[in-house]
């Protein structure tokens, strides 16, 4: 319910800002070109802003603390492991953070391969063997090396553009048909209240449907990150890490679309809306070598 409320508030803010932008630029919202410009502006703009803020948002959402200087042997091991794997993957050393949570989890985020972040939970460090922890870290390093954050940003931008554009095209047609009064010189948008209501409802519906697309891409990238981990540290270590995840608590995920966690929440209406494939499918993919080719 909270996510739906935030979605509606966000769209309300977008429409208000959109109106101001159109007033300042002189773009006619009733034209297809104007709608397309707006959809591209806000569809990709929101995604790239989220990407640029992803490290800050992710750290704030889990209360993570970036390690500036290792304070103990555990932090020293973590920093050395990340540094070694980053060199192997051919990326710059990411920032490394730890956050307090009982579940076994980790995530990677950041706008660029050379300005990324890897964060791990205290539950992971306490409950996983060094080999298993290495595999999880390698999974996150692979997300960075594969450019998954930018890939998902572009996908989200395309999806957002489609949702905004199609919603407003249909809303214009509905408002003109249901509330337009050309004899009185009313605008081609028709009744503005009908336009607003229809646009909001359609954005919600299309947004939910479009999330199926983004979730499919997210699951696809998880398989590739598992394969990347297997290449860095060995297939058996990654399989052992995934088997260990089966025993973990419900994971605390970073509150950012561009944060890639190792262990996605399992409760979902359908696998279509899951960010991560089921653990058994990930283990089977590693054993079959499907994504290692």
From Swiss-Prot:
Its EC number is 3.4.24.-. It is found in: Cell inner membrane. The keyword Cell inner membrane applies. Keywords: Cell inner membrane, Cell membrane, Hydrolase, Membrane, Metal-binding, Metalloprotease, Protease, Transmembrane, Transmembrane helix, Zinc. Gene3D superfamilies: Metalloproteases ('zincins'), catalytic domain. GO terms for biological process: proteolysis. It is a multi-pass membrane protein. The chain crosses the membrane at residues 4-24, 34-54, 158-178, 193-213. Binds 1 zinc ion per subunit. One of its GO terms (molecular function) is zinc ion binding. Its cofactor is Zn(2+). This is Protease HtpX. It comes from Citrobacter koseri (strain ATCC BAA-895 / CDC 4225-83 / SGSC4696).
